[in-house]
């Protein structure tokens, strides 16, 4: 994600502090912004014990109490809804006339964002969900810390036969943000698949590496020592919450290019959605 997501991250952090009070739930899906770690700091963090509680929820309108206890919405109430077989996060067409210049729209839709009311430090998190296969639209399931460390799964609608993984934990002395340096485009290993089909995406995170899987097939391992850039490690070391979201990547230009955007609202549905069916946390560390 690019600068648009960073701005939204800052604004959403303020909003959710007002909503959640002492729950400690903050921030928005952003690959960028926050603090990295020096070698010394990261070395100390390697000895940090896991803070993880097993958790499992089948998202459904038949059990709203479990959802209300475990998650808090950043976006307005009308931007999401529980149905019998999942949680739908909506992205609605912006009001008024939308014009496109180059690969940027003059208006960007506000999508739904849901945060967990709890954090974890290390563990295995599986998100079962799908997103729209519409260019310029991104559905995301991420781990995000108050310090803005991130571990991401992203479904880019403009590239529906692949999905993306990323880690972002910038160091304060970087000359410039390392946008996309640790991002990677992944295949679906068991034949042609699409982001608009339901799949189970897993982030397995410990002190030494992050591993991503889809439908129980491991596709990527990023080791802590491989995140060293500019003399500093860029590895997530802080407790993080779960974040579920859908967003419009039609601006700025760099974001839109990454997301194969902008959204063509002449052909795209007026309302699109990502559907999350199940979330599970395992604590093997």
Indicate residue ranges for each PLM-predicted region:
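Classical eukaryotic N-terminal signal peptides for Sec-dependent ER targeting/secretion
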Residues: 1-11
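Hydrophobic h-region of N-terminal signal peptides that target proteins for export
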Residues: 12-19
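GH16 jelly-roll
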Residues: 3, 19-213, 217-285
């Amino acid at each position: 994600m690019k600068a648009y997501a960073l701005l939204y991250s800052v604004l959403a952090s303020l909003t959710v502090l007002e909503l959640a009070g002492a729950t400690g739930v903050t921030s928005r899906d952003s690959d960028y912004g926050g603090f990295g770690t020096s070698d010394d700091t990261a070395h100390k963090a390697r000895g940090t014990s896991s803070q993880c509680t097993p958790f499992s929820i089948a998202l459904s309108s038949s059990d709203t109490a479990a959802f209300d206890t475990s998650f808090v919405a950043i976006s307005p109430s009308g931007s999401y809804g529980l149905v019998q077989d999942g949680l739908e996060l909506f992205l609605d067409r912006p009001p008024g006339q939308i014009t496109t210049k180059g690969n940027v729209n003059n208006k960007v839709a506000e999508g739904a964002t849901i945060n967990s009311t709890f954090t974890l430090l290390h563990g295995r998190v599986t998100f079962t969900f799908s997103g729209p296969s519409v260019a310029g639209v991104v559905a995301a399931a991420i781990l995000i810390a108050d310090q803005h460390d991130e571990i991401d799964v992203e479904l880019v609608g403009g590239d529906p036969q692949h999905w993306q993984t990323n880690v972002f934990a910038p160091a304060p002395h970087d000359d410039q943000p390392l946008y996309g340096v640790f991002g990677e485009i992944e295949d679906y290993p068991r034949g042609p698949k699409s982001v608009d089909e339901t799949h189970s995406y897993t982030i397995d995170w410990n002190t030494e590496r992050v591993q991503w899987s889809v439908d129980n097939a491991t596709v990527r391992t990023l080791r802590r020592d491989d995140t060293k850039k500019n003399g500093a490690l860029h590895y997530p070391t802080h407790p993080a919450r779960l974040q579920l979201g859908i967003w419009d990547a039609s601006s700025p230009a760099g974001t839109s290019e990454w997301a194969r955007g902008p959204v063509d609202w002449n052909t795209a549905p007026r309302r699109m959605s990502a559907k999350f069916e199940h979330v599970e946390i395992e604590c093997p560390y």
